[in-house]
A protein has these predicted regions:
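Conserved ABC transporter NBD signature motif
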Residues: 101-109, 117
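Q-loop/switch helix immediately C-terminal to the Walker
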Residues: 132-149
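Conserved structural motif at the start of ABC-family nucleotide-binding domains
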Residues: 47, 62-64, 118
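The feature captures the beta-strand-to-loop junction immediately N-terminal to the Walker
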Residues: 78-81
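Conserved ABC ATPase "signature" region
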Residues: 141, 145, 156-173
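Helix-to-loop junction immediately C-terminal to a conserved catalytic motif
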Residues: 93
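ABC ATPase C-loop
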Residues: 194-195
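C-terminal boundary/linker segments immediately following FHA domains
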Residues: 5-57
Length: 205
């Protein structure tokens, strides 16, 4: 589930102090005085990788990689097989912390607030994580049951599933088994799975 985070740390109950940041899913607010002031994140987050270095057994996989991505934009990283694209993706999503370097989301460190930001990052892997024997809609409903907060009822989950099916032009394939979809349709279903929770950042390997 998304959980509630105070200054990047998951909490159940905590007394707030002036200036604290509290996040629930993609919603973030700042505690000022006796009130919570919502922070405007509808414009998306800026994203920057700074001097990312990854080495294994003295073999350099990533060497001083830096780049920035503007909010609400699309960036493609291309290269031949073995160039380090998946290694970079693992580093900039926090799946593997690099030897050195930093990733900033807005003005905050991904690695210092990993538990919080992991709920706001969608990652579509090379290999689909879908249950091939399930129908498309059922596979997404199952994914929603695992990813949504426990207090989300069945009707709310079903509504969100229908929304992403429509957004990705999969409504007519809702009752078709995953293993009967075309390759492109399966990949769109994998994207739909990640979009269920409306992540602020979406990565595709």
């Amino acid at each position: 589930s998304n959980g509630t985070f105070l200054n990047g740390t998951r909490i159940k109950r905590k007394t707030l102090s002036h200036g604290d940041l509290i996040s629930i899913g993609s919603l973030t607010a700042k505690y000022v005085g006796t009130a919570l002031e919502p922070l405007d994140t509808k414009g998306g987050f800026s994203f920057a990788a700074n001097s990312i270095n990854v080495s294994i057994n003295e073999k350099v996989l990533l060497d001083d990689v830096s780049f920035a991505v503007n909010p609400r934009s699309l960036t493609a990283i291309i290269g031949p097989s073995g160039a380090g694209k998946s290694t970079l993706l693992n580093a900039i999503t926090g799946r593997r912390i690099p030897n050195t370097g930093e990733v900033m989301i807005g003005e905050r460190s991904l690695y210092e607030n990993l538990s919080e930001f992991s709920t706001q990052i969608g990652l579509v892997p090379q290999s689909d994580l879908l249950h091939s024997g399930l129908r498309t809609k059922r596979a997404l409903e199952y994914g929603a049951s695992l990813r949504f907060p426990k207090d989300t009822n069945k009707d709310e989950r079903a509504e969100r599933v229908d929304e992403v099916l429509s957004e990705l032009a999969l409504s007519e394939r809702a009752d078709l088994r995953i293993d009967k979809l075309s390759g492109g349709q399966r990949k769109r279903t994998s994207v739909a799975l990640e979009l269920l929770t409306q992540p602020s950042l979406l990565f595709l390997d």
